[in-house]
Amino acid sequence: MHELSIAQSIVDVAGAEARRLGASSVRVVYLAIGRLSGIEPGALLFSYELVAADTPLAGSRLVIEDIPIAIHCAPCAAIHELPGVNRFRCPVCDTPSGDIRRGRELDITGLEIDDGASTDFDSIDHDTSALGASQAPEIPA
């Protein structure tokens, strides 16, 4: 269950950002999780509650945005979303493609801190490499 270590990394990264902002607690952590990330959202939510206890994130909640899989199709010269993880073929022309453009994400995208303010993580200088993002294996064409 790697979700426990991922939850710990989320608490570490979000807690560090909250401290940098001078916040004493965090109310909400916003995540973007790709369908190919290998993360089970239910297990992550359970693990997060455990590791967030007795930290400035205790009692906070995770809001998870599900990121669908998208591939690039060379013949169509377009990016297409896929309906699932078991068929990496262009939904328009049926060409196989392993050129995955979305779906591996594991990103903290924002925080709501104790004063009600929201922070967009894209505007912050932060390192989320500890989260283990994009560790899904390459899917051959």
UniProtKB/Swiss-Prot annotation:
Coiled-coil spans in chain: none
A GO biological process held by the record: protein modification process
Binding site for Ni(2+): 2
Keyword RNA-binding: no
Annotated HAMAP family: HypA_HybF (MF_00213)
Described function: Involved in the maturation of [NiFe] hydrogenases. Required for nickel insertion into the metal center of the hydrogenase.
Stated name of the protein: Hydrogenase maturation factor HypA
Organism: Gemmatimonas aurantiaca (strain DSM 14586 / JCM 11422 / NBRC 100505 / T-27)
GN (gene name): hypA
